[in-house]
Amino acid sequence: MNWAREVALRIIRERPNEEVYTVASGVSPSGYVHIGNFREIATPYLVAEELKRLGKKVRYILSFDEYDRFRKVPGNIDKSYEKYIGMPYTDLPSPYTENESYATYMENRFLNELKEMGIEVECIYQTKEYQSGRYNKYIKIAMDRRKEIFTIIDSFRTQDATIEEIENYYPISIYCPTCHKDSTKILSYDEKTGNVSYECTCGYSSILNISTATNIKLQWKVDWPMRWMVEQVTFETAGMDHSAANGSKAVSERVVKEIYNYNPPVFTPYNFIGIKGGGAKMSSSKGNVLTLTDLLKVYDKNIILWFYAKYDPMHAFDIALDNDVIRYYGEFDRYVKMYFNNTIDDKNRTIIEQTGVTKDYLNNPNFSYLATFLPIVNYNEDLLKELLEKENINCNTKEYAERLARAKYWVETYGKDYQVKLLEEKNIEVYDSLSPLEKSWLEKTKEILENTYQTSEELQKELYSVVKTKDLSEEELKSTQKRYFQILYNLLLGTSKGPKLGLFLLALDKDKVKELI
């Protein structure tokens, strides 16, 4: 049983009487949503899918925290955006498009990525929710019980609060209607009328009433639990930073129980995701991110979901862009074949089901073949197709075209070790260093290449026989064959290793090979 099934069963045990199980996630449009943020989406999505498989009615919601303040300018956004710090994301203009906000641009980009991943969500836009008045009565509750909330928050602090701090604590921010920033200070609050008197550093001052105000935002540790109650959330996840002993999760759980009279949702924290070969933790605000769009250029959507499905959320892992891409493609392909052949174990069966893979996936060619031979045939797709069809690979499917594009992108962008080409001239230095016996192997190879072979396996078998003699033990034969192949790779590619020789030689012009060896 994998982690998503275990979490789904735990939710049912702890909340057995729910008519609808509301699974929630939230994303800030502070910048491009990266593959680390995607764990915020993938974790509840996989749990929601398991709840459905267990026969439960599920509502999966994605909240865009777009009414949060713009805190700092991401590294990939123009520094002129510093003038917008303190405004809600929906009040900022898009840095790349006209007639839409910063928030809308980032949100739509991410929603398009989710669509490509096949993930459907019910979106909740927090600016709309706050400005519609939907939350006003809950804001009033928080303001009326602000000292109780302060006591809860203060219980998680190590330093004692002063009387002044308690008296001046308000669990809200107010966006100024003039400068649109949250640089406001509350001067007084009347519980009976719900009137709030405030002033802004820009010079504006006013009185608003909570029941009709459209520019109030609850602070995070009150906003989060309030939304749990409003949406009747039964499961949510968040990063390790929120899940610390004195973090926002612990505070919010008490606030939702004691202030809003709602049991907190079942919770699973998640750990960070890195990029293999990269050091720093990804950050939208810093601009150093790998987005789903970037990742989909390398990996099929099913493989991306597989990464998130197979690792427990608490398990930190790296997504590889180096040569391990080949290994992951091979591993996933094997599991899919085992799944459809009904030879897979129960745990991996569940994981493969969670990726949404269909039988059409079996139309995919071997990624390693594509990555290996694309540069060798100088990215000539017609020649590659001719070669692969000899191996009985169907090159006329949608899956083939998509995997070919990913293999080409990966080799050109990340697969430096695979960017090999046939040498233009004979490597005289290597050839002259060979013994007479080793040179005789090359002559036999030339003779073999005079024949016609239907498949690479036929040619591979002939190549293995070149160095085979009766007096060699099995171990000696393996060592000799390895030496023979290294010689061929050095003479053809200038390296000591390379692709499977049978298929490799079928891809090449025979006369050119004979010239080089």
Regions found by a protein language model. Name each.
Residues 34, 142, 252, 300, ...:
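Residue-level signal for inorganic ion chemistry
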Residues 48-55, 114-121, 146-153, 183, ...:
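A generic secondary-structure signal for well-formed alpha-helical elements
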Residues 1-78, 225-244:
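N-terminal catalytic cores of NTP/NDP-binding nucleotidyl/phosphoryl-transfer enzymes
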Residues 81-117:
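A glycine-rich helix N-cap at a beta->alpha junction
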Residues 119-292:
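Active-site cores that bind ATP or allylic diphosphates and position pyrophosphate for catalysis
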Residues 1-18, 33, 59-60, 150, ...:
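Basic, alpha-helical terminal appendages of large translation-related enzymes
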Residues 244, 249, 256-259, 271-416, ...:
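Catalytic adenosine-cofactor/nucleotide-binding cores of aminoacyl-tRNA synthetases and other
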Residues 68-84, 138-139, 280-282:
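Charged, often glycine-rich, active-site loop that binds/positions anionic groups
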